[in-house]
Amino acid sequence: EATGYGYEIHEMSEMAQAPFGQIAISNQPSFHIPYLFRHSLHPEYTNLLIHQIRSQAFHQDFQAYPGDEDNGSLSAWYIWAALGLYPTCPGKPIYDLGLPLFKEVLLHLPNHELKICSNSHTTGAYFIQKARLDGKEKQEVSHQDLLEAQVLQFELSWLPPQA
């Protein structure tokens, strides 16, 4: 016979506080859910969810994280989301493209610096029109390409790209 905990576990309380349906970004198994839309008929939903989660679930006060920090996992999710990259499939050296938070970020890699730039400072520009790695258009980026590249440029707009 299956029984419950006898009380509400913290993940359920956290999920009830967030207006994101079943995503529950406070629980690690949900971290990848917004990025799965990149592989669907509606990839534009990824960036809408990322924007909503970053702006509504994370705060700059004493309760910065939605739920407990779990040894840095929520911080790591937020950093990936702010960079505009996400390792959706563990063990596969591919990053899905998301919604960069900053106009420019400089990553200090072992042999060089990688600049990630976007026009994301423009309010409402949540949709990727084009992403270029050293001038070549990309839909996703390999780890090796990131290690060798100089510039990852996101061109964002207010409307999703036309199919």
Indicate where each model-derived feature is located:
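Exposed beta-strand and adjacent loop surfaces of beta-rich binding modules
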Residues: 104, 128-130
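Short strand-turn-strand beta-turns centered on an Asx-Gly dipeptide
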Residues: 110, 130-137
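Core dinuclear metal-dependent hydrolase active-site scaffold
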Residues: 124-126
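Short coil/turn linker and secondary-structure boundary residues
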Residues: 41, 136-141
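Active-site core of glycosidic bond-cleaving carbohydrate-active enzymes
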Residues: 1-101, 105-113, 120, 144-151
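Short, isolated positions in well-ordered beta-strands
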Residues: 113-116, 138-139
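C-terminal beta-strand-rich structural cap/linker in extracellular carbohydrate-active enzymes
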Residues: 143-163
